[in-house]
A protein has these predicted regions:
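A short SAM/SAH-binding and catalytic strip from SAM-dependent methyltransferases
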Residues: 112-126
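Core SAM-dependent methyltransferase catalytic element
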Residues: 200, 217-237
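Class I SAM-dependent methyltransferase SAM/SAH-binding core
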Residues: 52-54, 58-102
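A short acidic, Gly/Pro-enriched loop at the edge of an enzyme's catalytic core
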Residues: 104-113
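Short alpha-helix
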Residues: 182-205
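Conserved class I S-adenosyl-L-methionine
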Residues: 2-47, 60, 64, 81-84, 142-172, ...
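A short glycine-rich, Lys/Arg-flanked "PGG" loop and its adjoining helix->strand segment in the class I
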Residues: 127-142
């Protein structure tokens, strides 16, 4: 665990395990049965709307929104993830390699909805990222965000300073392969302040239950309700 004064942030190198991660993500409790259903619910009716998926990974949320009638675009920092997404959505899809922390390759005011599911917690400084996401949104457009719930860090790292912006890493396993992901924790007050400082209006914050159709064998002992991710719907004035 490291504070901001000693570590320069770096993106997780998904290229090393893109296929393994995609396979694990497609049917996992936290992604397939928790995060994606809530992201789709908060995005609302996307038929005929232009939707950007920021940090799209291998594209499952893009596929779901396209199937609901959206005109989708997406970007991710990992070329390997983008290759998988392009295979799923077709070679003519607007899927690009781009960095959430850098200026984005899109014009101003072009998207009705922007989704950013489980990507911002890889970013140390949210200000430039949120400024860019707001820039590409049309006035009145909706930004839907999912992050690791800050309270998860408080529960799992009780000896650490909850109120400090902190870099930490965790190992995951799938089919015998181990991969490491590195995150930036920030307290809830800093999450909310970042959105407000970006000029966004918070219209909803949710801690949902898992999808009612979740296979029972995937659920934890506490059932459908547990603390995992925190979701926001925001509006660009």
């Amino acid at each position: 665990m490291t504070g901001t004064d000693t570590i320069t942030p770096e993106a997780p190198d998904y290229d090393d395990f893109a296929a393994t991660y995609a396979a694990a993500n497609d049917d996992s409790l936290f992604n397939a049965w928790y995060a994606r259903p809530e992201m789709l619910r908060l995005a609302g009716d996307v038929r005929g709307k232009r939707v950007l998926d920021a940090g799209c990974g291998h594209g499952p949320l893009m596929v779901a929104m396209r199937d609901r009638g959206a005109v989708v675009a997406g970007f991710d920092l990992s070329p390997a993830m983008i290759d998988i997404a392009a295979d799923r959505l077709g070679s003519d899809s607007d899927i690009r390699v781009a960095d959430l922390s850098a200026p984005l390759p899109y014009d101003d005011d072009v998207f009705d909805v922007v989704t950013c599911s489980l990507a911002l917690h890889y970013v140390q400084d949210w200000a430039p990222a949120l400024a860019e996401l707001r820039r590409v949104l049309k006035p009145g457009g909706r930004l839907v965000v999912a992050i690791i719930h800050p309270f998860v860090y408080a529960f799992c790292y009780q000896d650490e300073d909850y109120f400090a912006l902190t870099r930490y890493s965790e190992d995951y396993e799938h089919d015998g392969a181990t991969f490491t992901l590195t995150y930036w924790h920030r307290p809830l007050q800093d999450v909310i302040s970042a959105f407000l400082d970006a000029g966004l209006v918070i219209t909803s914050a949710t801690e949902p239950e898992a999808d009612p159709d979740t296979p029972p064998e995937l659920l934890p002992p506490e059932g459908h309700r547990f603390i995992c991710f925190l979701f926001f719907a925001l509006e660009s004035p």
